[in-house]
Amino acid sequence: MIKVNAISIGKIETLSYGNYKPMQSALNKIPFKGQMWLNRLGFVDDEQAYHNHGGIHKAICCFSKSNYQLFKDDLDQLPEFAMFGENLTVEHLDEADVYFGNQYQLGDTIIEVSDIREPCWKIQAKYAIPNLVQKMSQSGKTGFYFRVIKEGYVHQSDNLKLIKKAESNTRLSVKDLN
């Protein structure tokens, strides 16, 4: 069982960071309470401002809270959840151990690792850490995406359970492709 610290959703809003012009983003996500329907495109109340930030193969963004430690010297206080705009903040799920095609149960749903996550400049702008995107990319600690195999309800207290491993003769980890 993989502990889920938070399942978060966001609404599109206009954000202003530093010298950047105002932008549309749903980067500021907050944990939902109770249960929510997860369909092929993601959590029904979650929004994405840009086409490449969602879709069938990027329905859920996942990031390990243990990876927040990469930035402990850059920030006065690390966030408790959704630091990088992820939907699932898990306690620890290392990109080297996460394989494309791995399937997990989350509540009533089945989700499958489907894509790498390429860090966005908006995260760098939010935290005013000049090398944040480069640091994430070079570390291989970028998070990843799930597609939804089986739709259903997810409760705020649900955890992830690995139910099917990717085929061993062809599997690639998220870290392999980062």
Predicted features along the sequence, with ranges:
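A structural micro-motif recognizing beta-strand termini
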Residues: 91-94, 147-151
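Glycine-rich active-site loops that engage anionic ligands at enzyme catalytic sites
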Residues: 100-150
